Regions:
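Two-component/phosphorelay signaling modules centered on CheY-like receiver
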Residues: 11-36
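Alpha4 helix (beta4-alpha4-beta5 surface) of REC/receiver domains from two-component response regulators
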Residues: 62-66, 70, 93-111, 119-122
């Protein structure tokens, strides 16, 4: 069964994403907002895709606060993890953000919160994993 790592700091969003991904997508789900943990999970091959919140309040890497854009850049610049599909999710979607976030981060997909079309969310992840 494919596994999706959810990188999110809001417990409600974690619950919602977990339910959508397990019920509709038949995925296993891992959750973390700890950067070292995220990098270790990705490098270990334990995840087939990542759902990455853009705005993370508690994530720190090398002593600095980092957001989902920066974590995605780190993952995409590493030979061992750059192949893992990453979908950015954000509640702060403004006109032009999608293209800007995708270009800056190197992520493979983007969806705004709240996730209204649950099946489209699952389908986007499945398509990237194919």
């Amino acid at each position: 069964m494919p596994t999706v790592l959810i990188v999110e700091d809001d417990p409600i969003n974690i619950r919602v994403f977990t339910k959508i991904l397990t019920k509709r997508g038949n995925f296993e789900v891992l959750c973390s907002e700890d950067v070292e943990d995220i990098l270790a999970i990705a490098a270990s091959g334990k995840t087939d895709a990542i759902v990455m919140d853009v705005s993370l309040t508690n994530s720190v890497y090398e002593g600095k606060s980092v957001d989902g854009i920066r974590i995605t850049q780190i993952l995409k610049s590493n030979e061992a993890t750059k192949h893992i599909p990453i979908v950015l999710v954000t509640a702060h979607a403004m006109q032009g953000d999608r293209e800007s976030f995708l270009k800056t981060s190197g992520a493979d997909g983007y969806i705004s919160k709240p996730v209204i079309d649950h099946q489209a969310f699952v389908d986007q992840i499945k398509e990237m994993m194919a």
